[in-house]
Every structure is written in C-alpha cells, then in structure tokens.
C-alpha cells in the first residue's frame, strides 16, 4: 500500500506536529538517529513512542527521585507490574494506570478499557488478578447534568468490565471538585498473586525465536491513543472519540486464561510476553526487543485484522484491546497455537528475532520500516523543563493561617456529611461485584480492601488515596500527606505497608508552575516512601490533564498494598462492642488549609497545609500495628476528609452503637482539622494497660462506645449531641439525591 506521504512531503507539510512530535525532535531523528528522512510509517512510530505517555520524556528526571528497591521488592519499575515478596515463595503483583483522556471523551469505553489494560499488565507477569480498585475524580455534580452522565457511564464501564471477567472490585476512592469539570480522572489499579518462580518478563531474545500475536483482531480504534493522552483538550475534544479504544471483557477473560495456562504449565515454550497497550504493536514489540538486546522483524500482512485495507501505520499504532505479544521458542509455535485455539483466540506468528538491533517491518511485500530499535525506546530526546514556584504559594507563606468560625459543631458535621467527597459512595460500589471468588474479607467502604490468600493464614490489604487540594497548596507537603494517608489506611486494616504504585496526574508540564509542582510533590512522595519503607514498584504518569488552559489540581494517586500475616487480626473500621475505650492516635493541630470545612465555608481553598513529622508518625504507626498483631485493638479508622468528627460518625454507621466522647480541652474547630497521621481506635477495657504502654504519648483516651445510637461529643466551647440515624441518613442520601437532580 502506498505511503500517505513521501518523506519529502512529510518534511514540508509537518504532519507530525499534530501527533505531539516537535520540529526539533523531527530534526534530531533525521540528522542524528537515522541520518535520513523517515517515511510516513516510521515517523508515526516515533510520534507514538516519543509521546510523554510512552517515553516519560518530561517526567523521567522526576521519576528518578523515587526509591524503587527494598528487601521485599522482586521486580520494580520497568516491567508490566511491580512484584513484592509476601513470604512462602509467593508475591503480590500490582500496578495502577490512568485512562483520563479516554474517560473524559467517552466515559463508558474509556473506563472499561482502563480496567482491561491494567489487568493485562498484571497477568502478563504470570500473576492471577485477584482485585481491582479505582480512583475516580469528577467535577461538581450540582447543576451539572453532563458531569452526572459522565459519572454514571464511568462507573458502569468499570463495573461491567470487572464484573464480566469475574474479578472483585475492592473499592478505592471518589472525589468531587470543580477543577475536574473539564478533565475527569480514571485511575485503575489491579492486584494479583503469583508464585515467584512463575514470574515472566517482557523481552524478546534468541535468534530465530518467533514473535506471536495472540488475542483479538486489530481494528482502527485507538490509533494515536498514546499521543492523544499526551496533549491537553480543546473545546473540540469530543471529536477525538476515535482515539478511544473499545473493550470486550469476555475476550479478555479468555485471553487471561490462555496466557496463564501457557505461563504456568508450559513456561519452557515461552521467552517473553507483553500487553499491547499504549501505542499498540509498536510499543510492545520495540520494548521487548530492547529488553532482549535484539533486533526484530515483523510481517504486518500476518497481523489478524478486522477491518479491510489497513495501512502499516494503522496496524502498528492501533490500540485495539485484548491483545498480547509473545516471544516463543522456535519449534513451539504450533503448541502455543493449540492452547489459544482451545479458547477460540487467534495465535499467529508475525515475525522473528533477528541479528543486530534493528526494527524491520514489511507490509504488502515492501519494507516500510528499518530503524534502530533503541531509537524508538531509549534515544528519546529529553529536554529540561523550566520550573517556577507559583506566586500564590509565595503569598500564602506570608499570610496568617485560616481558621473556621461557626456556631454549631453539629450543624457543620451534618453539612460535611452531605459533601459528595465525604458522603457514602454505595451508589458507586453497589454496581461492582466485591465478593466474587469468595476471598473478600473487607469490602468497599472501609479504609482498605482486604483479601484472603487461599490455603494460608495471610491476607493482603490495598487502598488508593489522592488529595489534590493539599498538593496544590504545597506540593511537597501534599505529596508526603498522600503517602501518610495510604499508610494509615493500610495500618487501620491490620496490615503492614509493603510498597506503592502511583498515577501522577498533572496538567501541562510545559507550564513552569505545573512542572515545579510535579517535581516538588514527587520529592515529597519519595521522602515519605523512604521513611515508611514503601518503595515505588510501578506506576504511570498522566500529564496534560487540562481543558482550554484550565488544569486540574496536581493529583498524584498513591496505591498501596500491605500484608496481614494472620487473618485473625484483620481490623474492622466500625466499633464492635459497647463499653470499649475509644482512643485518638496522633496529635491534632489547627490544620485547615485545603480541608473540606475550608472549601465548604469559604467556597475555595487557601493557605499552607502543615508539614508532617514523618519519623514520629512512622514510629507510632509501627507500634499501633504491633498492638494489632497482639490482639489489643478491636477497631480502627483513619482520619481524613472532614477530620475527627466525620471519622467518629463513620465508625458507628451501620452498627447498633453510639459514642460518648470527652474532648473538653478541644476547641470546637479542631473537630474538623485534617492533621495527617491520625486514627481512632477502640480497645477492650482489659487491654487498656497493654495498649497504652505500647503507644505511650501518641494516644489519648477520648471516650467510650455506648449501646445507644447517639453521638455525644463534649468540647471546650460546644457540645454535640446528635442521633446517629439522622447523621447516617444525610451521609447515605447525598450522592443519590444529587444524581436524581433535574438541575
């Protein structure tokens, strides 16, 4: 098939500018890497592989800040997913990915294929996916029917894909803020389990070994999806639907089972395996060849296609879903085909490993590409980004701290429970199957989801956490607080934190203020990860999250996994028994910058969040976890949005109990402070002495669990006495009422 343009026409008309490749990069490719003009197919491959989504050319210097090694880390960043040792020859495998741009444009398919892609990353490692989590960030729902529609479709996409494939969704988080009105965020996380001996890699090596394409056929959906994800939106972004992929969860289920059968039962046939994700065939094949220090030759006429007359450019850049690329030992091609045939899936040899390190493509009898493979994967032109500290942060450093003023603590609590970010998210989670496979111990709605590991006493805990408001106000402190939030959630479940994955969601990195925020927040994340011994083992970067120049808050999502060695000590979020003692873990300060109460009362956020004492928090959380493993803690709940008052209320929702709390030395405003690193725990009276001796000054006894459904809080300058049922009604009805609104 004739190329769409000659190399000379490409140089003159510059179509690559529409694919996020700059003129400087084009000249560098021509003059330094190829020493000739690239043809249409080749420049298409460069534009995809050099996109930020694939190359991380802007963010690589920042990613180097992260600690990636640890005594339990088996595989860090660089493969399909991170792998962490959980003893007994087993590992937990996990990764998070963003699908923000596709979900904003086409919410159902964008969300569904976001889930599908992250599943393939995990099972390509040889792990069976056991849980899905999602971190969803929407604009304001009130008076915004478009956002309500996008939310419904996003949730439906996540639920349909996960439910059809039979993997439980163990929760995550949902937040609402006007900064996401033009660019919603969908971050999906998958957790899998495997025996370490079964781990696979994405590599192609061994002269003459075959490159096999398996799974669904290739169509024209998702072409230039990677470059679409590496540019901001315009008012015309609805026309970009063709860059959104279409998923088939039933095909994914078959593909997963076939791949796992091959990996677990016939690993001697397999050299390497990788998902065809962003940038489709070119990304998976070029990365596998690079990893194996090999060359690769592909015949695109052999690629299974569901649409006629596809060009080499279209075949290589299609992001059709449910496809994998294998490197198979020569002589075992028919064996592999038989496995996939049993699942009614295509399995076709489309190429081979060759001498040298060139990447060669043939289409319709012509050589359409012959370039050094590393020019696509490693020779990406990195350009230093400009950075500048935003003026609003400089100004905030000179301003006095904001503190709320109000009459009634009870009324403020009711208003906070009605805020969508705080309100019960059952409207969302009830659309997900959280119990399939019968291993779920703690369902969505708690601080962390908990899943038992069959045939052992172990369990894994998992959570996702984001708070863009804190990161916006002070990126470094906000990054630290994001990690603290995840650590608290994992510890609250009874688990020891192991490692994290991340999704770094930011605006245009060419804006010096945004790039400064990216670097500073990642430094904060790195600092906290070192203190809490939670290395970064996987993740992704999603930049250009803005619409018509309006960027989202810098929103790094932390996905954390922890280990529970004995399921007898899984800790519930809700109080369990009347007369148990209630403790506040961690010190409370007047920390209101970026808080829910500030946004609710001011209509905006401002000021500087307090810097946490990372070492202090690490030490007392370590002691709290020790108390849990000794059976001293009955329940635990993290303090986050809304502060102490909200967490106290949540700990008695869906129970028969109430709380009698004495905070006579607390100013009423402190009920709503969001000081990080705090939890409320309940302890049986007979365990009081042992618990206090372990935690010391880090805990304060604040009250008792009662058998009456009343929340009573005595303060220095107020008293809150409220029926729990009325609070729970507000909390549960907020989101459903907004979704039913006609406005």
From Swiss-Prot:
It is found in: Cytoplasm. Gene3D superfamilies: PurM-like C-terminal domain, PurM-like, N-terminal domain. It is an enzyme of class 6 (ligase). Pathway: Purine metabolism; IMP biosynthesis via de novo pathway; 5-amino-1-(5-phospho-D-ribosyl)imidazole from N(2)-formyl-N(1)-(5-phospho-D-ribosyl)glycinamide: step 1/2. It catalyses: N(2)-formyl-N(1)-(5-phospho-beta-D-ribosyl)glycinamide + L-glutamine + ATP + H2O = 2-formamido-N(1)-(5-O-phospho-beta-D-ribosyl)acetamidine + L-glutamate + ADP + phosphate + H(+). It comes from the Bacteria. Disulfide bonds: none annotated. The keyword 4Fe-4S does not apply. Pfam families: AIRS, AIRS_C, FGAR-AT_linker. Its EC number is 6.3.5.3. Substrate binds at residues 98-101, 120, 245, 319-321, 542. The active site is at 53, 99 (proton acceptor). Mg(2+) 1 binds at residues 97, 540. The keyword Magnesium applies. Mg(2+) 2 binds at residues 121, 275. GO terms for biological process: 'de novo' IMP biosynthetic process. GO terms for molecular function: ATP binding; magnesium ion binding; phosphoribosylformylglycinamidine synthase activity. SUPFAM superfamilies: FGAM synthase PurL, linker domain, PurM C-terminal domain-like, PurM N-terminal domain-like. GO terms for cellular component: cytoplasm. CDD domains: PurL_repeat1 (cd02203), PurL_repeat2 (cd02204). Monomer. Part of the FGAM synthase complex composed of 1 PurL, 1 PurQ and 2 PurS subunits. PANTHER family: PHOSPHORIBOSYLFORMYLGLYCINAMIDINE SYNTHASE SUBUNIT PURL. NCBIfam families: FGAM_synth_II, PRK01213.1. Belongs to the FGAMS family. Part of the phosphoribosylformylglycinamidine synthase complex involved in the purines biosynthetic pathway. Catalyzes the ATP-dependent conversion of formylglycinamide ribonucleotide (FGAR) and glutamine to yield formylglycinamidine ribonucleotide (FGAM) and glutamate. The FGAM synthase complex is composed of three subunits. PurQ produces an ammonia molecule by converting glutamine to glutamate. PurL transfers the ammonia molecule to FGAR to form FGAM in an ATP-dependent manner. This is Phosphoribosylformylglycinamidine synthase subunit PurL. The gene is purL.
